[in-house]
Amino acid sequence: MSNVVTDPTNSKIQVRDLNFYYGKFHALKNISLDIEKNKVTAFIGPSGCGKSTLLRTFNKMFQLYPEQRAEGEILLDGQNILTDSQDVALLRAKVGMVFQKPTPFPMSIYDNIAFGVRLFEKLSRADMDERVQWALTKAALWSETKDKLHQSGYSLSGGQQQRLCIARGIAIRPEVLLLDEPCSALDPISTSRIEELITELKQDYTVVIVTHNMQQAARCSDYTAFMYLGELIEFSDTDKLFTAPAQRQTEDYITGRYG
């Protein structure tokens, strides 16, 4: 693997010798990398390479499934989240996630945003109103929803629903936002809106995105990790990785020779 180029003094997440298993299947093999604070890091690679698996270790989603296990260290602000003592609810408040398909809750737009906040904070109605407006504004959705906050989240278009999910994710004020192929089900215009939003979000959050779309990774991210068959092949500054990859496998993938 090529050298990790992020600034270790500014790392939000540090992955050290991470191995991950689905039962007996060895899905991630000795992964080590640093995720820099207030930057966008993209994971790319062919289907089945382990990029979504790696993403989901950052908030321990795998704990929902007894046959899945992780070994090694994932340090969030220097604390290893893989220990049994880690409070998973608090971890997921710090590390939010947006999935591939928009997943609005079956409730109003307002309550979609307020739902998670109520789990962690007791706000007055006025403060909650302010938080809902803040989150929708951050997600570039306020102007489109301010007059219909009490309509169902399902009444929104697909692109709007995904921005609603992003707003819901940031409403609890996490420190890290994980995006698992957030644009794969969206049209080009909605995709463009999400990409603009990702660029803006890094001012306040550390963003990690999994994408099949190499052009999207090139447009949105500061750093890119290329994975293949559970291994981290190359991790570099995005511009460098796409213009002068250090590894032949990386070059073959980004030029379409395989994957």
Curated annotation (Swiss-Prot):
Keywords: ATP-binding, Cell inner membrane, Cell membrane, Membrane, Nucleotide-binding, Phosphate transport, Translocase, Transport. One of its GO terms (molecular function) is ATP binding. GO terms for cellular component: plasma membrane. It is found in: Cell inner membrane. CDD domains: ABC_PstB_phosphate_transporter. It is a peripheral membrane protein. ATP binds at residues 45-52. It holds the Pfam family ABC_tran. The complex is composed of two ATP-binding proteins (PstB), two transmembrane proteins (PstC and PstA) and a solute-binding protein (PstS). Part of the ABC transporter complex PstSACB involved in phosphate import. Responsible for energy coupling to the transport system. Belongs to the ABC transporter superfamily. Phosphate importer (TC 3.A.1.7) family. NCBIfam families: 3a0107s01c2. This is Phosphate import ATP-binding protein PstB.
